[in-house]
Each structure stands twice: as structure tokens, then as C-alpha cells.
Amino acid sequence: MADTGAPGYRFTRLQFTRHDAKHDTQKAYRVNLAIPETPAPEEGFPLLIMLDGNAALMEVSADLLTELSQSAAPPVLAFLAHDNDLRIDGDARAYDYTPAVNESALSAKEQRPGREYGGADGYLSFITGKVIPAISDNTPVNPEKTGLWGHSYGGIFVLHALFTRPDSFAFYAPVDPSLWWGEGYILSEEHDLLAESPADIKDKSLLVLTGSGGEAKRRPRGDRDAATLAAVYKARESVPAGETARMVERLKAAGVDAQMTTLQGLSHGETLGASLPYVFRQFAR
């Protein structure tokens, strides 16, 4: 798609590096940027940033982009990914998308060689301080209408941004967020925000999408043996069933324009692609 474009949208690619202070290394990222072919409105285009940009872009059809180009407010779509050809870079996203927590809060599944967590604050600063300004230099963007989409761990990141730096975006779209991660740590961030500064999120827009089909059945493989899978399911029990819906209701009561939609019959993994048309259409209204 990024090579061919679609009627109504053209693509360009931006490259980025950022310094990871924890490891004293440079990390590379890229954004496949889909820009409406229509003239930009005076205030600039809305901008929607997608985490796991490689995976998200693989799920977007030319027909969907053409439909979007004809909407009331066609957005610029920024597919942000680690600079490789992996659909999902599991280790890189685990670090970039998760908040810093005490290691004791991590499940056995999460505590595995080569996987680190806790880089979300630095990654959010990278997005707001470097990625968005570079996009704005490339095409006119409306700073009052920016959005962030993320799935699973990416959903944690979206909520972390809302709960800790709500002015980063106007529209937040977490898809099947892994609320169980870190023994429900993200819910403690929500609690702190609502207790200390609920006015900070008043009038923000939140669209939460979840699946109803649960986890697709998995066979043990490689490092995901039966014991590891058991740890996964145990970790998910750290957050009561229905907590996502209750979180949405709490945020709605605090003044957030919050809604939740269930994608019927879809497993956690299937919600990634299925959520995109719904989110795009809501954002472009």
C-alpha cells in the first residue's frame, strides 16, 4: 500500500532515530505517512498516529482509504513502526509501549530473557517532541485534532498517555488494551488521575474497542510452553472481568467523551485489523 498509494491518498515515508538513555543506544523508527490528496483545510488536517504501524498498514485496504478521503474531515494517517520489516516487533514494542513498574509486578510470561519493559515515557516524548513536529513540517496538521491508536500493549500506551499527559492528544483509541499487564498497573494511573486532577481529561475523546471472542486457542511452541501459557492466563486474572467497561464509565463520569464498542466474535489478535475501519470513520467525522 505504501508503495502504490490509493485513490484519494498519497504516501511518503519519514525516518527517525532517537537516543535510548537507558541503554545508551540509537533506535531507528519509520513512519509511513498517508496524506489526503485534497487541499488541506485552513486549520490543517486531523492527524491520527497508529502504533505497530507495520501491522496496521497491512490491514488497511485501498477501498478504505478511498472512502476515508471522501469523509467530512479526511485525516493524515501516520503508521509509526520500528524500522524493520517485522509485522510486530515483540521485544521492541514491549519496552516502548509499557510504563515503568516494579519487576515484582510482572508475570512469569513477561519476565523472559531479552525482554524489557518501562520505556513508555521516553517513547511518548519522542512522538510528541519529534514525530509530530516532523509530520507537521511535511504537511499541514491541525494541532487541536490529533489522535493515537494502539492495540494490546499499544492500548496500554494509549491509556498511559491519556492518564499521565492528557494534553498530548485530543482523541485516544485503545484496542483490547492489556489492562492485566503489571498486575493492572494502568488502572492505578487512572485512579491517581481521577483522584488528583480529573479536570485534565475533561472533553478528551476516548474510543475503546474490545473483542468478545477472548484469546484464540494456542498450542505450546518454543518458549511458550504449557507453563508459560498458564502464567499468561493467570496474569489476566489480576484484573476482574468487565473492568474495561467499568473504566470507561468512570472516565465518562469525569467528563471524558468516552465510549466502548465490542467487536463481536473476534479474538484479541483479530481486533487489531477489525478496529481500524471503525476508528478511522469515527475520527474523520
Describe each region flagged by the PLM.
Residues 75, 167-179:
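A conserved short beta-strand
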Residues 65, 155-166:
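Short glycine-enriched nucleophile-adjacent loop
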Residues 43-126, 130, 134, 138:
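Serine-hydrolase catalytic machinery in alpha/beta-hydrolase-like enzymes
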Residues 275-285:
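Catalytic active-site module of serine/aspartate enzymes centered on a nucleophile-bearing elbow/loop
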Residues 1-46:
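A domain-start/cap signature at the N-terminus of enzymes
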Residues 139-152, 172:
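Alpha/beta-hydrolase fold nucleophile elbow
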Residues 176, 180-262:
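The feature captures the conserved acid-bearing segment of alpha/beta-hydrolase catalytic domains
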Residues 263-269:
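Histidine-bearing beta->alpha loop at or near hydrolase active sites
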